[in-house]
Amino acid sequence: MLLEDACQALGGTYEGKPLGSYGDLGCFSFDFVKTITCGEGGAVLTNNDKYAINADQYQDHGHDHIGNDRGEEAHLYMGYNFRISELNAAVGLAQLEKLDAILQLQKRNYEIIRSVLETVEGVTFRRVPEGGVENYSFLNFFLPNGELTQKVHKALSENGVDACFYWYTNNWHYIDGWEHLRNLKTLGNVSSKFRNQIQKLNETDFSKSDAVISRTISTLIKIGWTVEEVKVRAEKMKAVIISAL
């Protein structure tokens, strides 16, 4: 089974095919910093009937959803309470109708900022494969080394440029900050198989990842910005980066 994590990739494509449709299952997130949101949660996409049925049952206590009487439904196995509410689902459907407009705004704002930062010596960007169209919810750029990147990140914050993230020292999205996972700090029991797999994290060489993440700053692309606001932000980022370098 190929489980495709496309949580931050909604709207991205490769050779005309949407990201999230390459795996047996594609996963999307709808939390508040994703391309569209319905409060929390996400969605799983699949063309496999068995996977679809299993996912539908598993997220609702294992109910088989046969018939109209919930009290008469069978439970083929244990599941969890991961159901989305009708209110959240309604918000999600409304967001889907706005998706094309949201993507256009993000692309516009992304390209304005990138076009300005491209003129700064020492700033580079990730490579998108030929035939690929990326998701524009974040602009990721690289600086020559980790020390300079931390300096620039601090300077951006001190100069009022919000929503710029340095994941390398952030406890949110990088393995160095995941002591709870590496040391299996949990309120419950875990299987020996899971414990053995997690233990490998403490023995894994992440030096290549460190070399990339330590030089990366990610800036959120908001859809509420006007063109003028984006231009002002871009020029401010440019000035701060040049000053820090």
Model-predicted segments: where are they?
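Alpha-helical initiation/capping and key positions within long helical/coiled-coil segments
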Residues: L105, A211, E229-V232
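Hydrophobic residues in beta-strands of the RecA-like P-loop NTPase core, especially within AAA+ ATPase
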Residues: L3-E4
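Secondary-structure transition into beta-strands, especially the periplasmic turns and strand N-termini
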Residues: D49-K50, G146-K151
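Conserved PLP cofactor-binding pocket of PLP-dependent enzymes
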Residues: G62-G71, I112-L117, H153-I217
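Active-site region of PLP-dependent enzymes
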Residues: A9-K17, Y22-F138
